[in-house]
């Protein structure tokens, strides 16, 4: 039996320990309480970004051209796994290659990012597992028309716009991200807190294009048939309302299927004889020629300054009207000689040659029309025949629309309307006349 002195010593030691414990507890609560509480909150709570659903792109009638589909990215911390074999089997069932599943469940590895993105339903049993970390992602899905895909554009693996209307209209489509507080339980699983403060994500706007998908499909098939029959490398079709400026269809076809841009907007070419009507319009406007005025067309062959000019439709003489109808090179060169280089330049610049049209497309090409000071001695004749100049198919369509609508150059439009998540319009296309040209 311990002596009274030893018992006293033990009691004293226990009392001193109790006092020290009370003092330390008070110190922790009074002086360090806030710091420890913050540390505990950090361990159990975390801030998370809530992705905003990207807005849809639809055609003029409301048919969906592209929309977002919610997906999930997975990462694994193998040392945290409770049952590596269970995870490996679940990953294989979700379509993950066995080699990747084995890597993700190897406890010797610290962290494994599982390649690819998954439908939430396919990984619903995987996401709650301890050691599995899920991150929301999205995928753009829509119609299969290559022309529409080129016009709409692409997103990269991180969901950022790369080109096309996805890039041009990103501020309207991307929405606003929200925030949420995530709670970790004892097993490391994460759940969104139902009580902690957060902000709701605001979905992106819906963008309605001027494109009519049914008409677009007709143009795609017609273009494919024409390219095949003609043995051509490619082609473009632009269908434009000459009065409103709305682009109703925009089909492009190139031999390389990887071509990512809408070439009717992005690839200029020499227009050739299609520019002759604008030279004729300038002549008529300035009173330098009459429709029935006749010039010598030399039976289809003529030499000017040592340069041989020919016509496919051979005739000794033609009126200005016939020159345009038969696309006579000889006739238009002789008539165009009545214009100064500056006047000939203005005839084309006025209808938009060499200038961007104003459509919201990042890769739009302006084409080329050099200032008269940079012309050579043969340039006036070449340009009258549509050479030494480049235009895009859209530019040429806009120029011809000015003839069709009575003389006004109307800015083309690809976007008909933009609506917010509630369906309220935030933008509507309105006809814009750039200038009167004829």
Regions inferred by a protein language model and the residue ranges of each:
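Hydrophobic alpha-helical transmembrane signal-anchor segments
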Residues: 2-35
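Small/polar-residue-rich segments within soluble enzyme cores
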Residues: 30-31, 75-76, 80, 85-98, ...
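Short, basic/aromatic recognition patches
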Residues: 35-51, 215-229
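Short, small/polar residue-rich loop motifs at catalytic or cofactor-binding pockets
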Residues: 44, 49-53, 177, 231-235, ...
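Short extracytoplasmic
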Residues: 45-71
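Short beta->alpha transition motifs characteristic of CBS
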Residues: 52, 68-75, 155, 249-255
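Beta-lactam-recognizing serine transpeptidase/beta-lactamase-like catalytic domain environment
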Residues: 185-196, 235-273, 278-438
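Conserved, well-ordered alpha-helix/loop/beta-strand core segments that scaffold catalytic motifs
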Residues: 191-235
């Amino acid at each position: 039996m311990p002596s009274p002195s030893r018992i006293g010593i033990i009691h004293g030691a226990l009392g001193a320990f109790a006092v020290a414990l009370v003092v330390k507890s008070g110190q922790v609560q009074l002086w360090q309480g806030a710091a420890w509480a913050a540390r505990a909150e950090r361990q159990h709570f975390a801030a998370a970004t809530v992705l905003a659903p990207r807005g849809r792109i639809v055609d003029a009638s409301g048919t969906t051209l592209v929309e977002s589909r919610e997906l999930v990215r997975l990462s694994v911390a193998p040392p945290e796994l409770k049952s590596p074999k269970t995870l490996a089997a679940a990953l294989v069932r979700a379509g993950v290659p066995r080699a990747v599943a084995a890597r993700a469940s190897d406890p010797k590895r610290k962290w494994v990012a599982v390649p690819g993105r998954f439908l939430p339903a396919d990984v619903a049993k995987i996401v709650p597992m301890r050691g599995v970390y899920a991150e929301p992602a999205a995928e753009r899905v829509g119609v299969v028309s290559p022309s529409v895909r080129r016009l709409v554009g692409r997103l990269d693996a991180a969901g950022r716009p790369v080109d096309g209307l996805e890039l041009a209209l990103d501020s309207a489509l991307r929405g606003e991200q929200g925030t949420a507080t995530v709670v970790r339980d004892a097993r490391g699983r994460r759940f969104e807190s139902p009580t902690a403060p957060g902000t709701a994500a605001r979905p992106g706007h819906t963008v309605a294009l001027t494109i009519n998908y049914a008409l677009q499909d007709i143009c795609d098939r017609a273009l494919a048939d024409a390219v095949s029959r003609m043995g051509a490398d490619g082609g473009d079709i632009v269908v434009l309302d000459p009065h409103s400026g709305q682009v109703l269809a925009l089909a492009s076809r190139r031999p390389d299927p990887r071509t990512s841009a809408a070439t009717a907007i992005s690839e200029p070419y020499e227009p050739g004889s299609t520019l002759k009507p604008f030279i004729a319009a300038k002549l008529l406007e300035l009173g330098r020629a009459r429709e029935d005025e006749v010039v010598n067309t030399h039976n289809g062959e003529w030499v000017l300054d040592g340069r041989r000019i020919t016509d496919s439709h051979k005739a000794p003489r033609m009126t200005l009207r016939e020159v345009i109808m038969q696309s006579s090179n000889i006739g238009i060169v002789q008539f165009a000689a009545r214009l100064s280089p500056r006047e000939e330049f203005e005839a084309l610049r006025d209808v938009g040659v060499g200038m961007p049209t104003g459509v919201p497309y990042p890769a739009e090409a302006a084409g080329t029309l050099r200032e008269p000071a940079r012309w050579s001695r043969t340039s006036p004749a070449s340009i009258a025949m549509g050479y030494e100049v480049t235009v895009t198919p859209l530019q040429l369509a806009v120029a011809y629309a000015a003839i069709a609508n009575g003389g006004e150059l109307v800015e083309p439009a690809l976007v008909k309307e933009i609506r917010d998540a509630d369906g309220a319009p935030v933008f509507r296309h309105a006809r814009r006349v750039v200038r009167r040209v004829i």
